[in-house]
Amino acid sequence: KEYLAKKSVWIFGGDGWAYDIGFGGVDHVLAQNKDVNIFVFDTEVYSNTGGQASKASNIGQVAQFAAAGKEVKKKSLAEIAMSYGYIYVAQVAMGANPAQTIKAISEAEAYHGPSLIIGYAPCEMHSIKGGMTNCQAEMKKAVECGYWNMFRFNPAAEAGKKFILDSKAPAGGYQEFLMNEARYSRLTREFPERATVLFQRNEDAAKERYEHLLKLVDMYDGK
């Protein structure tokens, strides 16, 4: 055994696969409690098949099959995985915090069991102002305004360090962030009144999500 290197198994896929059409398989693999790692590139849309809405798409987002803006919030894949209690789970955004991304990957690799890392991944379907050259900056904005949260759940960590919330409290500018991407801003031109309602629901859901993550910090800290 001393001459055999440890196998490192990583599976990479998009949100359409992990959240939606391949979710049953992803869930089955994670539930087996084997030493396998899954990295999901979360673009919040079916990027490779024409831009259809997926269960990772967010409230008010315009996509195929959601031309008037998606009405319901996105699925919480991370928390579904966390509910097992023995899966390493992290959400990352490289443009916002490269060190946190590397740390999550390192921890997942070192963890003796299944792991799931979900990375925020801007894509052409988002139609970011200035184009994809701004995708790293867009990740940072997403985290700063509270649209995307970064955290790490490590079942093997000591008490008080099992759940680490790496995101700071939202700094504002949420609606401005949405308007910087045509996947949202186009709704204001086509259905302005509906856009106002859905975008506010999107922001409210983000606030609730952050408050929930704070409660998870307290819960795993034993407070």
Predicted regions and their residues:
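Glycine/aspartate-rich loop-and-adjacent alpha/beta segment that forms the canonical ThDP
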Residues: 101-197, 201, 211-215
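Conserved thiamine diphosphate
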Residues: 3-5, 57-111, 179-186, 192
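Acidic, Ser/Thr-rich peripheral helices and adjacent loops at domain boundaries
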Residues: 53-75, 133-153
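Thiamine diphosphate
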Residues: 1-52, 89, 95-112, 186, 193-197, ...
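Short C-terminal domain-edge/linker segments immediately following a structured domain
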Residues: 41-45, 68-72, 121, 146-153, ...
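Structural signal for hydrophobic packing residues in well-ordered secondary-structure cores
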Residues: 30-34, 44, 82-88, 105, ...
